């Protein structure tokens, strides 16, 4: 009972809303000294009046040096559009394949820019609710049943992995001299369009067909 009251008291003391520069500095200093994880300890260690979840999201989506805060490039736009055709509104899966971008960044950019740029049948089927949902990518699905609903997430994971495999094969086929030049460009310009590592998935149109990433078993769950 005492533990519950203490937790309720702590929850009431947590701040919400915009972070201040001072709060950001406290969080960055903590991560610098203690690393990521154990976010709930930050309150006790630093006195920062933010819950562990808020600290984690603030770090992952804004403060982490791995987050690219620059404008989206044409290559990134192309990649996001391709992945959305495969995966629908599964922003976490998409963001893992767009180096330096978070799922929130990708989701917000899709809703505010990319979905409005697309025209025709595909754009009319796009949902812009801003949340992950169970909608199916319009490229493949016209009707879905509930019999395989529980298998859909595994199917999307498998599709994403096949996409990774296609890109990895494309990477291996590139001449070593070209790869070395791209590594230098990436190091000097920080432009992800020059990078062909396993975490960057820009491939030419000729390298794959989206429909080839669906197996017969996958299709069974959607038709």
From Swiss-Prot:
Residues 11-63, 64-118 form the HTH myb-type domain. SMART domains: SANT. The lineage of its organism: Eukaryota, Viridiplantae, Streptophyta, Embryophyta, Tracheophyta. Its main location: nucleus. GO terms for molecular function: DNA binding. This is Trichome differentiation protein GL1. Keywords: DNA-binding, Nucleus, Repeat, Transcription, Transcription regulation. Residues 39-63, 91-114 bind DNA. It comes from Arabidopsis lyrata (Lyre-leaved rock-cress). It is found in: Nucleus. Regulates the production of a signal that induces hair (trichome) precursor cells on leaf primordia to differentiate. It holds the Pfam family Myb_DNA-binding. GO terms for cellular component: nucleus. Gene3D superfamilies: Homeodomain-like (1.10.10.60). The gene is GL1.
């Amino acid at each position: 009972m005492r533990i519950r009251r203490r937790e309720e008291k702590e929850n009431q003391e947590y701040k919400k809303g915009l972070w201040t520069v001072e709060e950001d500095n406290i969080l960055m200093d903590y991560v610098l000294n203690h690393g990521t994880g154990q976010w709930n300890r930050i309150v006790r260690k630093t006195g920062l009046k933010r819950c562990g979840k808020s600290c984690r999201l603030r770090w992952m989506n804004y403060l982490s040096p791995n987050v690219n805060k620059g404008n989206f490039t044409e290559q990134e736009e192309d990649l996001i559009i391709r992945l959305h055709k495969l995966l629908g509104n599964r922003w976490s899966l998409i963001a893992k394949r767009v180096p330096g971008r978070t799922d929130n960044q990708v989701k917000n950019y899709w809703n505010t820019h990319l979905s409005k740029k697309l025209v025709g049948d595909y754009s009319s089927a796009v949902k812009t609710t801003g949340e992950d949902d169970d909608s199916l990518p319009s490229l493949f699905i016209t009707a879905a049943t509930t019999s395989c609903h529980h298998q859909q997430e595994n199917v999307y994971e498998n599709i994403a992995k096949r996409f990774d495999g296609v890109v990895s094969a494309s990477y291996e086929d590139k001449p070593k001299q070209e790869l070395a030049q791209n590594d230098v460009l990436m190091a000097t310009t920080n432009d992800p369009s020059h990078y062909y590592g396993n975490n960057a998935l820009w491939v030419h149109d000729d390298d794959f067909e989206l429909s080839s990433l669906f197996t017969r078993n996958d299709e069974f769950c959607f038709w």
